[in-house]
Amino acid sequence: MNQSYGRLVSRAAIAATAMASLLLLIKIFAWWYTGSVSILAALVDSLVDIGASLTNLLVVRYSLQPADDNHSFGHGKAESLAALAQSMFISGSALFLFLTGIQHLISPTPMTDPGVGVIVTIVALICTIILVSFQRWVVRRTQSQAVRADMLHYQSDVMMNGAILLALGLSWYGWHRADALFALGIGIYILYSALRMGYEAVQSLLDRALPDEERQEIIDIVTSWPGVSGAHDLRTRQSGPTRFIQIHLEMEDSLPLVQAHMVADQVEQAILRRFPGSDVIIHQDPCSVVPREGKRSMLS
C-alpha cells in the first residue's frame, strides 16, 4: 500500500471530522435561535457526522497498517466495517428525524427568525460542497470505500441543506408545516443513503468480485499475451485499496517450464501496471489437462 494512498485517505477523514465539528457549533446556535425542526434535523445529522467521521478516522488508520503474521492479507476489510458502522449511525439519525418531523407536522411551531436559519444553512451548504468535492477527488485517486461512504453521507447533507433552505423560505411566508414535511423527506432520503451504503459494505465483506469492466480488462490482458493459449478460473475480490486477482493460464504442453514461468511473470507485471498494488496469483496449466467441456466464461 503506497504512502500516497494513506496520506490522502487520512486527510479526507480529518477534513470530514473538522468540518462536521464546525457545522455542529453553527447549527446549535441556529436551532437555539430559530427553533426550526429542519435545522434540528441538520443538527442531529451533524452529531452523527462527527461520530461517523471519528469512527472513519480511527478505522482508516487501522486499515492502513501493513499485513502481519495474523493478518496475511492486510487490514483493508476494516474500511468495509467502517462503512457498515456509518450506515448504522445514519439509519439512527434518519429514524430520529422522521419521528421529529411527524411530531412537528401534528403540532407545528412557528420559527422566531427564519432569516438567521437561511444564512446558517447557506454557510453549511457551501462548506459541505467544498468537503464533498475534496472527498470525490480523493475517491478518484484511491478508490477508498471508507471515504466513498463518507462522501455519500455528506452528499446527502448537500441535498438536506438545499431542502432546509426551501423549507425555511416557505415558513417565512407562513407555511409552518413545510418545515416538518421537509424534515420527513430528509429523513427518508438519509435512510435510503444509509441502506445503500450498508449494502455495499456487506458486499465487500462477502468478497464480491470486481466489476465486470475490470474483470474483462484482466481477461483481455491475459488472452492477448504471446505464449498464452487461453485462461480460466478467474477469481477476484477487493479489500480496502488492494485487489486480489487469481487466474489460470493455459499454455502449450511443449513450452519449457522456465519459459512458462517467464510468460506468467510478464502477464503478472502487465496486470499490475493496469491495477497497481494488486495481489496477483497466476497458475500455469498445460492445454492438454484443461477439459474443453469444463471451460466456462470467466465473467460468470
Curated annotation (Swiss-Prot):
Chain sites annotated for binding Zn(2+) 4: 261, 283, 285
Domain of life according to the entry: Bacteria
CC annotations in GO: plasma membrane
Effect upon mutating residue 45 to H: Loss of cadmium ion transmembrane transporter activity. No effect on zinc ion transmembrane transporter activity
Binding site for Zn(2+) 1: 45, 49, 153, 157
Binding site residues for Cd(2+): 45, 49, 153, 157
Result when mutating residue 49 to C: Does not affect binding and transport of Cd(2+) and Zn(2+). Can form a Cys-49-Hg(2+)-Cys-49 biscysteinate complex across the dimer interface
Expression induction or repression: Induced by iron and zinc.
SUPFAM superfamilies, per database record: Cation efflux protein cytoplasmic domain-like, Cation efflux protein transmembrane domain-like
Residues the entry annotates as binding Zn(2+) 2: 68, 71, 75
Assigned keywords, A-Z: Cell inner membrane, Cell membrane, Ion transport, Iron, Iron transport, Membrane, Metal-binding, Transmembrane, Transmembrane helix, Transport, Zinc, Zinc transport
Activity regulation (record text): Cytoplasmic zinc binding may trigger movements of two electrically repulsive cytoplasmic domains and reorient transmembrane helices, thereby modulating coordination geometry of the active site for zinc transport. It may modulate activity in response to cytoplasmic metal fluctuations.
Record keyword Transferase present: no
Intervals, Periplasmic compartment: 31-41, 104-117, 159-178
Statement: the UniProt record of this protein carries the keyword Transmembrane: yes
UniProt cross-references to Gene3D superfamilies, sorted A to Z: Cation efflux protein transmembrane domain (1.20.1510.10), Cation efflux protein, cytoplasmic domain (3.30.70.1350)
MF GO annotations: cadmium ion transmembrane transporter activity; ferrous iron transmembrane transporter activity; identical protein binding; metal ion binding; zinc efflux antiporter activity; zinc:proton antiporter activity
Biological process terms in GO annotation: cadmium ion transmembrane transport; intracellular iron ion homeostasis; intracellular zinc ion homeostasis; iron ion transmembrane transport; zinc ion transmembrane transport
Its job: Divalent metal cation transporter which exports Zn(2+), Cd(2+) and possibly Fe(2+). May be involved in zinc and iron detoxification by efflux. In vitro, can also bind, but probably not transport, Hg(2+), Co(2+), Ni(2+), Mn(2+), Ca(2+) and Mg(2+).
Domain notes: The two transmembrane domains of the dimer swing out to yield a Y-shaped structure. In each protomer, the cytoplasmic domain adopts a metallochaperone-like protein fold. Each protomer contains three zinc-binding sites: a tetrahedral active Zn(2+) binding site for zinc transport, which is located toward the center of the transmembrane domain, and two cytoplasmic Zn(2+) binding sites that may serve as zinc sensors and regulate activity.
Note: Asp-49 and Asp-157 are required for both metal binding and transport process. Asp-49 is a selective binding residue for Zn(2+), Cd(2+) and Fe(2+). Asp-157 is a highly specific coordination residue for Zn(2+) and Cd(2+), but not for Hg(2+) and Fe(2+).
Full protein name: Cation-efflux pump FieF
Organism from which the protein derives: Escherichia coli (strain K12)
